[in-house]
Design a protein with these regions (language model features):
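PLP-dependent aminotransferase class I/II
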Residues: 89-173
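Short acidic/glycine-enriched loop/turn segments that link adjacent beta-strands
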Residues: 104, 176, 209-212
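Active-site pre-lysine segment of PLP-dependent enzymes
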Residues: 14-26, 39-62, 66-99
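Short beta-strands and strand-loop turn motifs
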Residues: 6, 30-36, 62-66, 173-175
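PLP-dependent enzyme catalytic core of the Aspartate aminotransferase-like
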Residues: 47, 194-198, 203, 207-249
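Short, small-residue-biased leader/transition segments that mark boundaries at the very start
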Residues: 2-9
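Conserved PLP-binding catalytic core of the aspartate aminotransferase-like
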Residues: 154-155, 163-198, 214
Length: 249
């Protein structure tokens, strides 16, 4: 029977490639890495990734999810497609749901060796992409200005969000994506419910081994401000409630 094994994230919330490599056996057929990672936003270094790919047995496919690649500010960040010729067992996946803003069309793609592409082509649905989605994607690929504006907006929003979180006393995980995860000091699901009551949606990420963290997407300046304002309000209410319940109060 086919089985999957989830690996714990290492210190500072990134992927432990050495642990992943050590976990590979003769029965392993596929390894999955998101770079930048979701939901923490961390990324592995180019050297770490190259060394990992070189060490993975050739019978193991390595799926490198680069959904958030365009948000990475480091110009020298490794583009997985650039090393496909060197590592034929590498499969790079991308999406138009993030930087291009086309989540509704559900359009993604992979770049791989002809061997894997042939296998994937045999298994795919006959009408897996519609013509409207393809037209939208072709238009998006020609709109470089929109992508550049999205990157600039995300950069400014990330500064606004992280400075706001720091000002409120929350520790966040430095992110290379379009979101940031932070330690809310309580079960993330509890904060999720309180934020929801205020009309703000965040994502609890306990299922990723981070029970006290939530992830919030970077939005427009007014949206970021709205989130930070609600978070401050919830924190103030919690502090007041705690003081009222303190012994001798």
């Amino acid at each position: 029977p086919r089985r999957q094994r989830q690996m714990c994230i290492r210190d500072r919330y990134g992927a432990d490639l050495n642990a992943m490599l050590a976990a590979i056996t003769d029965k392993t057929r596929l390894v999955f890495i998101a770079n930048p990672n979701n939901p923490t936003g961390t990324r592995v270094s180019d050297r770490q990734l190259i060394d990992f790919l070189a060490a993975v047995p050739k019978h193991v496919w390595v799926v490198l999810d680069e959904a958030y690649l365009e948000y990475v500010e480091d110009e020298d960040h490794l583009n997985g497609v650039s090393v496909l010729a060197e590592f034929p067992n590498l499969i790079v996946t991308r999406t138009f749901s993030k930087i291009y803003g086309l989540a509704a069309v559900r359009f993604g793609y992979s770049v791989s060796s002809l061997t894997f592409a042939d296998l994937l082509n045999r298994a795919r649905q006959p009408f897996n992409v519609n013509s409207l989605a393809m037209a939208a994607v072709m238009a998006a690929l020609e709109d470089d200005d929109y992508v550049a504006q999205s990157v600039d907006l995300n950069r400014a929003g990330m500064v606004q969000m992280t400075e706001g979180l720091t000002g409120l006393g929350y520790e966040y995980i430095p992110s290379a994506g379009n979101f940031v995860a932070f330690d809310c000091g309580e079960p993330g699901n509890d904060l999720f419910q309180r934020m929801l009551q205020e009309g703000v949606i965040v994502r609890a990420i306990a299922e990723y081994g981070l029970p006290n963290h939530v992830r919030v997407s970077i939005g427009l300046p007014a949206e970021n401000e709205r989130f930070l304002g609600v978070l401050a309000k919830i924190g103030a209410n919690a502090a007041a409630s705690s003081e009222m319940k303190a012994p001798g109060s």
